[in-house]
Amino acid sequence: MQTTDLWSLNSGRVQAKLGVNTKEMPDKTPVSFVIIDNDHLNKNGVLYFCSLAKEFVLITSNANHPAFDVDESNLHIIRQNGPSLKEALAELKSEYGCERITIQSGGTLNSLFLHEKLFDYIDIVIAPVLIGGKDTPTLIDGKSLLSESELSKIGVLKLQECMVLKKS
């Protein structure tokens, strides 16, 4: 039984921190990956996702991104002049058949999705570990809401369930 989406969206920044720019090539998976990146992935990082993913879609506004020098049949590039998540998701659906996608990113990208009201379901896993500091990213980073009138900029979702995982 499939328990996860077959499309995963991540940021190049987080993936670079996880070491994809220096990792050896992985085995192919049935999951397709979308990476939003302007300058964090190098050629090895791009090839890593070409090896890993059924389909690899890079979204970038960088005309000199290393992905443009890679020739792999499963590599697709969406070039944007500026970030438009709504347009990118529409293109993922129309051009690549992406109906559902899991977004696993940092607070800055999460903030953009939230402010464009593009979340329709959220799974939050909270690990029993406390990490902090004023420079530590949070679940939603980005520009702060400054007034009550700005609450309309974010969507409200209904809590469906709260489940404690084993060994947590």
Where are each of the predicted segments found?
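Enzymes that bind and transform nitrogen-containing heteroaromatic metabolites
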Residues: 1-168
